[in-house]
Amino acid sequence: IGFYDSTLNARQYATKGYFEKLVAQVFTGKEKFIPGNPTETSFTTKDRQSWLQISYMKYAYHTMTPKFTLGWMAEMLYSSKNFSENYAATMLQAADFSPTPHSKIMYNEAFRANQFLAAGIKPIFVFNDMFQVRSELYGFMPIFPIKKNALNKAYYGKAFSRFEYLGEISVICQLPFGAISAYVNHYSSPKKEWNVGLTLGWQLFNYRFIE
């Protein structure tokens, strides 16, 4: 079940309005694990997984002056999902925090958890209908961070014991047929994780089966 509401003035690189969603999902299915390198001590496992997932997200933009807009966002997620056979499988199936287009197309274990809180702020300088400069800073805090033991099994760490952040600055040129975006961003983990990129056109992501 999902409830969505939006008054944004653009699907991407919006500067006015807000977007809000509340999603509740129930999943059930079978999980099968086959070792990649079978040994005498390894074995195939089959488990049934059932879990509840509830998420809420809202972001909004407020016009402070004709040339300056201040945006913000908040996101919360809770999932009762159990651990998978090993740490890698657990992290692959954990929910991710991906507020930027770049973060949506990359895999980063530091920004994944079964329960988390996140928030961000987005100062935007709007020069005209064509050009804008966006700066974004986000904080991500797992309620229970997922860790790995010596046997490559997942376990929960101490509550609220980890904090991650990411920041991005981008220059946007809006054209009738698409947008040109040049960006640089930084993730707190892995260390020294910097990225520079250029995108042409629109990056519009469809709804996922597991939100």
Predicted features, each with a name:
Residues 2-14, 127-132, 146-148, 161, ...:
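Outer-membrane beta-barrel initiation region
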Residues 70, 74, 121, 131-135, ...:
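Hydrophobic beta-strand residues in large extracellular and virion-surface proteins
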Residues 158-185:
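C-terminal structured domain segments
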Residues 171-178, 193-211:
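Outer-membrane beta-barrel "beta-signal"
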Residues 110-118, 122-167:
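Outer-membrane beta-barrel transmembrane domain signature
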Residues 185-191:
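A short, acidic, flexible beta-alpha connecting loop/helix-capping segment that sits on the rim
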Residues 27-29, 142, 176:
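Short connector loops/turns at beta-strand edges and beta->alpha or beta->beta junctions
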Residues 1-128, 135:
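C-terminal outer-membrane beta-barrel translocator/porin domains of Gram-negative envelope proteins
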